[in-house]
């Protein structure tokens, strides 16, 4: 038996860090929303009791380092599944980009194997399992738009922002999330107004959203990788309505309302940055149907 599952990327419209927890993680408060840039996973049931990861992308690990592998392993162990699975990942989301590509692959694996192996789990149960794999996996199980708190695994759903273009640009560098958080000095940063962002999203206020975007990690990543700051400046210069780094970077995104301006920004960045995408915000949450 075979199943195809979509794994959409996310961006952060607002990201704040409140402090460091006793378990070593940071306490966060952020707003994430899914976008129409997605990996595609093909899950094929195997009679043998093993997990196989396949991908043409050389940056995708084919062992237990892969979060999709970890998701399959978790379900096998928790529910004593004796079957195996082959997971083919068609990678579209850039790797290590601040877009939750690996987390979304894990979430898609949880949703897909729930069907393939007839586990009968609810989406809330899958999200709870996702938290055992990684901080963003719970959100990725649901998709849509949500406030994420705790270490990112506590999810409260809110309305979806008004539809618009999202232009993404990723430089050819990797950013260590651990290094970014390690260099964060909470008493020396400007904290975004996450509550205000929730308010303007719930009112469908596109201009308010553009005025309120913020990411407390930006200045840290910019200091470590000045090319990320340069991409943000270029995107602003080309006329994006709002520009922000997603997650710990290095991907920068711009929100754009008009098609003509989207094309201008996209074409302008293509000569400046290796990976550029123009996609839409996604609509509602994922379902198990």
UniProtKB/Swiss-Prot annotation:
Record-linked SUPFAM superfamilies: GHMP Kinase, C-terminal domain, Ribosomal protein S5 domain 2-like
Entry keyword set: ATP-binding, Isoprene biosynthesis, Kinase, Nucleotide-binding, Transferase
Pfam families: GHMP_kinases_C (PF08544), GHMP_kinases_N (PF00288)
GO MF annotation terms: 4-(cytidine 5'-diphospho)-2-C-methyl-D-erythritol kinase activity; ATP binding
Chemical reaction(s) catalysed: 4-CDP-2-C-methyl-D-erythritol + ATP = 4-CDP-2-C-methyl-D-erythritol 2-phosphate + ADP + H(+)
Coiled coil: none
InterPro entries: GHMP_kinase_C_dom, GHMP_kinase_C_sf, GHMP_kinase_N_dom, IspE, Ribosomal_Su5_D2-typ_SF, Ribsml_uS5_D2-typ_fold_subgr
Family per similarity comment: Belongs to the GHMP kinase family. IspE subfamily.
Function: Catalyzes the phosphorylation of the position 2 hydroxy group of 4-diphosphocytidyl-2C-methyl-D-erythritol.
Protein name: 4-diphosphocytidyl-2-C-methyl-D-erythritol kinase
């Amino acid at each position: 038996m075979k199943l195809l599952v979509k794994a959409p990327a996310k961006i952060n419209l607002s990201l704040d860090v409140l402090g460091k927890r006793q378990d070593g993680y940071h306490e966060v408060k952020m707003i994430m929303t899914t976008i129409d840039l997605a990996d595609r996973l093909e899950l094929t049931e195997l009679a043998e009791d093993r997990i196989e990861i396949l991908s043409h992308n050389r940056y995708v690990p084919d062992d237990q380092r892969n979060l999709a592998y970890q998701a399959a392993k978790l379900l096998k162990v928790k529910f004593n599944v004796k079957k195996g699975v082959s997971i083919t990942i068609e990678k579209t989301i850039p790797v290590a980009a601040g877009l939750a590509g690996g987390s979304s692959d894990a979430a898609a694996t949880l949703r897909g194997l729930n069907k393939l192996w007839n586990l009968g789990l609810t989406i809330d149960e899958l999200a709870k399992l996702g938290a055992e794999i990684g901080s963003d996996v719970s959100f990725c199980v649901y998709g849509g738009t949500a406030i994420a708190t705790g270490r990112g695994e506590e999810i409260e759903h809110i309305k979806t922002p008004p539809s618009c273009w999202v232009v993404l640009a990723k430089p050819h560098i990797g950013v260590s999330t651990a290094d970014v958080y390690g260099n964060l000095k909470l008493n020396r940063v400007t904290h975004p107004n996450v509550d205000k962002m929730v308010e303007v999203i719930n009112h469908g206020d596109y201009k308010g959203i553009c005025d309120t975007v913020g990411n407390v990690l930006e200045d840290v990543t910019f200091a470590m990788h000045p090319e990320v700051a340069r991409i943000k400046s270029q995107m602003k210069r080309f006329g994006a309505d709002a520009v922000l780094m997603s997650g710990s970077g290095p991907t920068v995104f711009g929100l754009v309302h008009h098609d003509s301006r989207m094309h201008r920004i996209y074409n302008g960045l293509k000569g400046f940055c290796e990976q550029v995408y123009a996609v839409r915000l996604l609509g509602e949450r994922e379902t198990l149907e």
